[in-house]
Amino acid sequence: MYYCGPNYGVNNLAVGFRCWDASFDTKLTVPYVIGVASLKESGVRSSYSTPGSSLWVSGFGGEYGNNQSYSGFPVVGGNNPALMTTDQSSCSAGYVRTGIDVGTGLNINSFQSGSHPENQNCNYTSTANGTSAATPTISGVIALMLEANNNLTWRDVKHILAATSEQIDSSRQKTY
C-alpha cells in the first residue's frame, strides 16, 4: 500500500512516490498495489489527500484534530477531527504537545490539555491524521478479511474492497 503525506514529498513505504495527482505515479498502476486516499469525518476527501483515478479505496484519516478551544478562543478552521489513538505517556511527550499554540503558549486542543476527564494523563492523542492514518486502517480491514479466509488472492481482496465500498464526494467540484 502506498500513502501520501501533506508535505508533498516522499513519505511512504516506497522511495519515489509523490503526492500530486496519484494517476501520475506508475507504481499505482501495478495491479497488486492498493492506493489509499483519506476521508474526513463528513465522508468527503480530506483537504490534503491526493486525488486520482488510480486510487482504489479511501479510509478515514480526518483533518488536523482541532476541537474545542482550551484557551477560550475560537479554533481557526473550526472543528476538524482526526483519529483517536494511543500516544506516548505523559503530557510532555508525544503528539499531545502539538496542541500548543505557538503564539500564546496555550493548549488549543481540550482533549490533549490534560484537563479532559478521559485523558488526564495525556496517554491518547486526538490528532492522528492523514493518509498515513488511513492506510493502516485499510490494512487492518484487509488483515481481518485474510483472517476470515486466508485463501483470498490479491484480486479477491481488491474485489471485496471495491464491492463493499461506496462512492464518496462524487458531487464535489474537482480542483485538480
Label the model's feature ranges.
Residues 149-176:
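An often Trp-containing, charged/polar helix-loop segment at the C-terminal end
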Residues 1-18, 174-176:
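Short, flexible/disordered intra-domain loops and linkers
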Residues 16-143:
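Extracellular S/T/G-rich loop segment that most often corresponds to the catalytic His/Ser-adjacent loop
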Residues 144-148:
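Active-site catalytic microenvironments for nucleophilic, acid-base chemistry
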